Regions:
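Single conserved hydrophobic/aromatic residue that forms the stacking wall/gate
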Residues: 1-7, 12
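Flexible helix-coil linker/hinge segments at domain or subdomain boundaries
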Residues: 44, 48-75, 102-150
Length: 150
């Protein structure tokens, strides 16, 4: 199945109300390869947030994907055959930040995308490491709940 069809199929299935699903693009008419589906973890409800998510963050994710191809983490010869799904958390308060630095936001999401792909392609963390460390790892928000901070 061509990646464009895979991406389209991923976009139309199981839509969650308010949780936008879009293909990562370099610009309004240039889709990144491998086809990459972005799924927002936040209900998108205002134009500024949408523009930041579907502009700065979307472009950053697309560049992080290409960085993975450029350095060989993803085989260039398989770029048309693979699909990536990225679950995106962008704090809703970003739309109220008048001093938002789009370059910093772009760089953070580009690097995070690249690092996540690199880990995934290298099977990190390994199942052995996870099993060995399971009882030592506490989700930070669970810990905050235990500590009475949320």
């Amino acid at each position: 199945i061509p990646s464009s069809l895979v991406g389209s199929e991923m976009c139309i299935r199981d839509r969650a109300k308010g949780h936008s699903k879009v293909l990562a693009i370099m610009n309004t008419d240039i889709m990144v390869k491998p086809a990459t589906l972005m799924i927002s973890k936040v209900t998108v409800d205002n134009t500024r947030y949408t523009n930041i998510l579907m502009g700065t963050v979307q472009g950053a994710i697309a560049n992080g994907v290409l960085d993975s191809v450029r350095d060989g983490t993803i085989d260039k010869n398989k770029a048309n055959d693979l699909g990536i799904i990225v679950s995106v958390w962008l704090n809703p308060s970003v739309s109220k930040d008048d001093s938002l630095d789009h370059k910093i936001l772009f760089d953070i999401h580009r690097k995070a995308t690249y690092q996540a792909i690199k880990k995934a392609m290298n099977n990190e963390p390994s199942i052995d490491w996870l099993l060995e460390n399971q009882d030592n790892i506490v989700h930070k928000y669970y810990q905050m709940g235990l500590d009475g901070k949320i």
